[in-house]
């Protein structure tokens, strides 16, 4: 942390004062804080009015004739004794003070390591001494102070030394209604600080350039010579009750790694199996909901998806959902036709249904492998694993085991006895005990590491899932784990991420909206409109798809990435987040969880009950997606009568406007014998010595063409402007 920021935060600490009350004096010869002999607390020595000490006592006050807090006999308290000096100071009273040393009118503080506030003695109606106190104002820092990207009003007050009430008033004047615990961003804080004459700079934590935000970028940056083959990472998806969990159990029970045999099985969200000495990592989070929830947070952990379809039930609604999610993720798919032992099993019917859903298996001439299995009988499990290894060989999954480890959190929880517990899938490098790690917005040091068999490990190589202990807080699923050389730097980055998360929480929207598409397209961000379509009945889906297909152009495509009937679910919203899609509900509404998720992440959900209204809205959005089209409008012609060369070597063309007019805003073409020599802009346009904006037909003028000097008498110049043409779908 910079010295500027430390001084900014420290100024608030220096502003806290502890009020001291003037007590009695002490006995003769003792420093202040006690009383004179025989006097009650708070009184004086013989002949002294209240607030002093016994005769001859050093400290807060003195006896008659001595300089001190009280006067001699007959004098009212607070002045001097006969011939005395200034009002007395206090002795040490044991109360907390600051390092500062303050000299007050009523006395002189001692350097006791505490702050002294201004105190004087007043008289109560009963004649007793009463202390009155003035608290010193907060000390404002000199020079610029460093402020984080977000902070509370209280933190801002402490950093700047400006009272919280003053800050709240300034915020109110600026149109911001806040309380002392309200978060404000740096821009707002800087404006308010400037109002109080305080200069600020935004604090940036060190070494942010080394922070991993995307594991794919890490892998792409590795030297190909350092990359080694790694096990594939597999997720199993499918319709409920089609046997996803049973298939996982069957795989695990038949092919658990031999080195782990006899261990105590731990549920850690992922595990490894072996076939022919090669490992395969399975994520034990079946279902596309978990898969897409992690994708929505930017996590890319799955290499291959196994789609489980029951041979007796065939393709079901959640099967179609899973297919949509896999296609959106762009990962290879293997179809596992399960329950082939069922009496009414029909694998060929399943393959035909998959073809109708756009998944063409190899038996039908496609490129999607399929295998028939029975999780119940543990039949053909090895066949499925062999196909997984074959797909892995084709895709050549690799990582660098010698790099500092990076990985993704699969799941995490707070354990009562062990503290934060997280399962991490190492994706590059090797994770080791005692590594300092940055995980999302938390940090820690790897104290313990074990696998799904409960075996303690000293290190974990790429594609290995392990449980780690030693984090300071519970991370979120999908957070990136990164080994850091310096734990202090990791903590600083984690703090910055926490502040950034608070700032993002203040934002109203992060998702794609139909209203925002026009500007997004103009900025070149989107050329494809992704839609998730949910309707009341299947017939409505077909009609809407047909209507939307009529709107496609060569430049803009509507892509329905998922379609289904019934309620809009949280899974739909997660897919929309991951795919930057809009959800359209045709006589379909979201459930409460989906509504909350959509509001949190700014996903646009549109509701319709008339197809025409739906297509009109989409058409308006697509118009903004079309490339702008321009046409030329010729405004005038001129003949080159003469040319002059300037000292700057630029050529001035002496023109006679033969038709229309010339304007500085127009483009110009230089033609010779009907051939275009140059097409560009006007650098200068003058009549005599004066700059002019335009010249009408029948007048002469001088003109310089920007960046072009090959002009001779007899050339013709054409002047035109470009006019935007509104596009239609």
Curated annotation (Swiss-Prot):
GTP binds at residues 238-245, 284-288, 338-341. The keyword Protein biosynthesis applies. PROSITE patterns: G_TR_2, IF2. GO terms for molecular function: GTP binding; GTPase activity; translation initiation factor activity. InterPro entries: EF-G-like_DII (IPR053905), EFTu-like_2 (IPR004161), IF2_II (IPR044145), IF2_N (IPR006847), P-loop_NTPase (IPR027417), Small_GTP-bd (IPR005225), T_Tr_GTP-bd_dom (IPR000795), TF_IF2_bacterial-like (IPR000178). GO terms for cellular component: cytosol. One of the essential components for the initiation of protein synthesis. Protects formylmethionyl-tRNA from spontaneous hydrolysis and promotes its binding to the 30S ribosomal subunits. Also involved in the hydrolysis of GTP during the formation of the 70S ribosomal complex. This is Translation initiation factor IF-2. It comes from Roseiflexus sp. (strain RS-1). The lineage of its organism: Bacteria, Bacillati, Chloroflexota, Chloroflexia, Chloroflexales.
